[in-house]
Amino acid sequence: MPTEIYVDGASAGNPGPSGIGIFIKHEGKAESFSIPIGVHTNQEAEFLALIEGMKLCATRGYQSVSFRTDSDIVERATELEMVKNITFQPFVEEIIRLKAAFPLFFIKWIPGKQNQKADLLAKEAIRLNEKN
C-alpha cells in the first residue's frame, strides 16, 4: 500500500511570509511537519510543499508514494512534467528529478476540505516564520 502524503503551501501575502504543511501516513503511523520557508507567493509555497514532501519520503526510503494536493496547478504540472508559466519551471524540474527516487509515484488533486491537516500545518509554519 502506498504511503499517503498530504501537502499544502500557504502565504500571508502574495508574496509574503510563507509556510508548508506535510502530513504523512505510513504503515499505520502519522507524521506532521510545519516548515517555514521565508517569503514566497502562494503558488510557490504549493510547489515547495510537494518538493519538501518528496525529499522527506526519499530520505525515509519510501518506494510507493501517493501525494495529495489541493493545488490543481501543482497536480497538473507534476502529471504533465511541464508548466505554462516559466516562473514555476525550476520547481517542475526539481519535481521531475525527485520522482526518479520512487518506483511508484502518484499525485492526486483533492478539495481543500480534504486537505485540512496539511493546511493547518502550513498556517502554523507561517506563524513560526513570523516569529523568527
UniProtKB/Swiss-Prot annotation:
Residues 1-127 form the RNase H type-1 domain. A divalent metal cation binds at residues 8, 46, 70, 119. GO terms for molecular function: metal ion binding; nucleic acid binding; RNA-DNA hybrid ribonuclease activity. The keyword Nucleus does not apply. Its cofactor is a divalent metal cation. InterPro entries: RNase_H-like, RNaseH-like_sf, RNaseH_domain, RNaseH_sf. CDD domains: RNase_HI_like. Keywords: Metal-binding. Not known; does not have RNase H activity. Belongs to the RNase H family. EbsB subfamily. PANTHER family: OS05G0353850 PROTEIN, POLYNUCLEOTIDYL TRANSFERASE, RIBONUCLEASE H-LIKE SUPERFAMILY PROTEIN. This is 14.7 kDa ribonuclease H-like protein. It comes from Bacillus subtilis (strain 168). The gene is rnhA.
